[in-house]
Amino acid sequence: MKLTCVLIAAVLLLAVCQLDSADATGYMRKNPSLRSPKRTRGCKSKGSFCWNGIECCGGNCFFACIY
C-alpha cells in the first residue's frame, strides 16, 4: 500500500513538472526576447535560489541556478 502511494505521488510530481516545462516553453516561444542567449538583465546568477530555469542567466535551475 505504501509503495503504491509513493508511486502515484512520483507519477503526479513528474506530470506537474512536464506541464510546468511545457508552459515555460510556450511562453518563451511567444516572447522572442527570452530566447536570446545574450539576455542577462534581470536574471539570477549561479547559486541563487530559483523555481524555474527562465529565472537563471544560464537557463538551468534545480532549486538553485546551476550556471
UniProtKB/Swiss-Prot annotation:
GO molecular function: ion channel inhibitor activity; toxin activity
Propeptide: 25-37
SS bond partners: C43-C57, C50-C61, C56-C65
Protein's recorded name: Conotoxin Cl6.6a
Subcellular localization, as worded in the UniProt entry: Secreted
UniProtKB keywords: Disulfide bond, Knottin, Neurotoxin, Secreted, Signal, Toxin
Free-text comment about domains: The presence of a 'disulfide through disulfide knot' structurally defines this protein as a knottin. The cysteine framework is VI/VII (C-C-CC-C-C).
InterPro entries, per the entry: Conotoxin
The UniProt record lists the keyword Disulfide bond: yes
GO CC terms in record: extracellular region
Signal peptide (UniProt feature, chain positions): 1-24
Homology family: Belongs to the conotoxin O1 superfamily.
Tissue/organ expression: Expressed by the venom duct.
Parts of the chain that traverse the membrane: none
Principal cellular location given in the protein's record: secreted
